[in-house]
């Protein structure tokens, strides 16, 4: 195993305040890991200072019954879980009592182990600094500030003197025999007393848990729990709901409603006697059960336990005298500080006080070299930071700012001009593109029209050629010159040329039109034939008349064309 370096040992000592041997041992156990060693040291906490005293074998206490060794709450919880029952099915009175009786860190309620006939023996315990008047066989009454497991009237006659010792001199009571062979007081066999014993146990467990929670808020080392208990959230939920159900059941049986803190406060006021034992030990007295007050003996004095107290960084303040003399539970409940009620710390800090939070932050800063930036740093506890008054800027700085602002404005104006120019060019390009598109469409339409016109003309020419071919084929044969009915017609064309042919007087005027058309000088139906003297124009309306009918009877006639 590698030996830890001196720097890790010094850091461990500076954080925990332990000795060199403890630091070396913890670092060797955790293979030189400083964080795990520090966490393990603080997790062990109270268990490192617990010392067990040897069990007196000559204890002459009468044993009525043997109470079996209880199991740990984790084993009970896991056992119930393996059976198949849900965790919250354990929320009954017996489960709550087993949980609080089995926890090694929770204080155990006292058990008066003597029968009723033996309780008349006077018990006197002297201060540890002086000699004791009794032998070592005299039993020590443990934790009589809480309620003892005794049913029925108990009359204890005798004097019990409080023995207050420091934490360094008084070992804790042995756990082995008190857990395995613990003698129980004589109890009644009827069901009513058993039920009262269960209720009394549940009340005591709830009040003890509330008191320990308030004490743990001032000293975080007293509330150190095993790691496996902190990791199991189901156990915490089960214990909380069990306490709540136990308190509600007790309150219903008593016939009134009050909070746990009110019950504890009223019980403290009722428990204070003329001797004011609460002022002697500096602690809040736990409430006594309403089922214990069956005895009317005015000379009865309470048994005071031999109770060790730890020396911690913070302790509970002694109760106020005015509050102890207060008569109403409401005033006592209002006077209890938030630390005693256990509900005065913000939930966002995990239920710890501001002092504990500051210590945790300082510890983390010492370990990691800085204050962590977390969302739960309590800013209200920081001192107010003075704000610096604003100073006027220097003239040079003002001039530089003005120049910079002018440059920025000019730059923005230049950018705007560039944007405008770019937008204008874009608009011009779009306009040109639109014009080109329009011109292209017009050109395409014009070309289409020309093509259609050419196609139409071509078709007309083709049709005209067919008609002219038909007219040429229909022309009668030209007669001979010496024939009596023959007539020669000379026609002057618009281009100045002349065309002549012999026709019969019996031929129709349409035959003359066909002869002119096949010359292909003018188009058909676009002209008229005119005789100059006497002037007479021949049109299409006279095309069916013969030449003789029209007066063209001479051997030779001259005609010309007149365009319509």
Curated annotation (Swiss-Prot):
Biased composition (Pro residues): 381-395
Stretches the record annotates as Disordered: 210-229, 267-358, 371-423, 443-483
Residue positions where Phosphoserine is found in the record: 295, 324, 326, 328
Keyword terms of this UniProt record: Acetylation, Coiled coil, Phosphoprotein, Repeat, Ubl conjugation pathway
Residue stretches in coiled coil: 412-478
Subunit structure: Interacts with RABA5C/ARA-4.
Record protein name field: Plant UBX domain-containing protein 8
Organism this protein belongs to: Arabidopsis thaliana (Mouse-ear cress)
């Amino acid at each position: 195993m590698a030996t830890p370096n001196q720097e890790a040992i010094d850091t461990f000592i500076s954080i925990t305040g332990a000795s060199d041997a403890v630091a070396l041992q913890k670092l060797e156990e955790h293979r030189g890991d400083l964080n795990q060693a520090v966490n393990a040291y603080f997790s062990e906490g109270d268990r490192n200072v617990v010392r067990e005293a040897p069990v007196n074998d000559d204890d002459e206490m009468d044993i009525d019954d043997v109470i079996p060794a209880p199991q740990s709450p984790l084993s009970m919880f896991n056992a119930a879980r393996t059976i198949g029952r849900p965790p919250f099915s354990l929320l009954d009175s017996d489960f709550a009592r087993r949980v609080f009786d089995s926890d090694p860190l929770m204080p155990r309620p006292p058990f008066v182990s003597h029968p009723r006939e033996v309780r008349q023996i006077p018990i006197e315990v002297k201060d540890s600094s002086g000699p004791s008047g009794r032998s070592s066989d005299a039993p020590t009454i443990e934790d009589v500030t809480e309620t003892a497991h005794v049913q029925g009237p108990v009359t204890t006659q005798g004097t019990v003197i409080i023995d207050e010792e420091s934490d360094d001199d008084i070992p804790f009571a042995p756990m082995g025999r008190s857990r395995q062979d613990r003698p129980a007081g004589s109890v009644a066999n009827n069901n009513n007393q058993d039920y009262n014993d269960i209720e009394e146990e549940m009340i005591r467990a709830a009040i003890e848990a509330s008191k320990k929670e308030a004490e743990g808020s001032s000293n975080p080392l007293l509330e150190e729990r095993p790691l496996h208990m902190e990791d199991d959230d189901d156990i915490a939920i089960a214990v909380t709901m069990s306490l709540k159900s136990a308190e509600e059941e007790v309150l219903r049986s008593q016939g009134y409603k009050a909070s746990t803190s009110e019950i504890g406060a009223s019980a403290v006021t009722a428990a204070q006697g003329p001797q004011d034992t609460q002022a002697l030990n500096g602690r809040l007295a736990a409430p006594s059960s309403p089922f214990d007050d069956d005895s009317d003996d005015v000379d009865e004095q309470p048994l005071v336990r031999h109770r060790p107290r730890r020396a911690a960084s913070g302790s509970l303040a002694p109760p106020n005298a005015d509050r102890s003399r207060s008569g109403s539970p409401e005033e006592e409940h209002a006077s209890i500080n938030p630390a005693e009620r256990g509900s005065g710390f913000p939930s966002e800090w995990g239920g710890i006080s501001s002092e504990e939070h500051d210590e945790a932050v300082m510890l983390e800063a010492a370990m990691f070299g800085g204050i962590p930036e977390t969302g739960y740093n309590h800013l209200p506890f920081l001192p107010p930071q003075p704000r610096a008054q604003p100073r006027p800027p220097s003239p040079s700085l003002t001039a530089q700012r003005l120049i910079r602002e002018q440059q920025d404005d000019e730059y923005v104006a230049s950018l705007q001009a560039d944007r405008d120019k770019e937008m204008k060019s874009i608009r011009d390009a779009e306009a040109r593109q639109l014009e080109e598109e329009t011109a292209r469409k017009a050109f395409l339409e014009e070309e289409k029209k020309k093509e259609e016109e050419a196609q139409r003309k071509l078709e007309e020419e083709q049709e005209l050629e067919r008609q002219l071919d038909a007219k040429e084929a229909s022309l009668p044969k030209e007669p001979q010159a010496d024939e009596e009915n023959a007539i020669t017609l000379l026609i002057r064309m618009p281009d100045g040329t002349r065309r002549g042919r012999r026709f019969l007087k019996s031929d129709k005027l349409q035959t003359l039109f066909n002869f002119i058309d096949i010359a292909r000088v003018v188009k058909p139906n676009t002209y008229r034939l005119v005789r100059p003297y006497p002037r007479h124009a021949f049109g299409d309306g006279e095309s069916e008349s013969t030449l003789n009918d029209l007066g063209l009877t001479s051997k030779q006639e001259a005609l010309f064309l007149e365009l319509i």
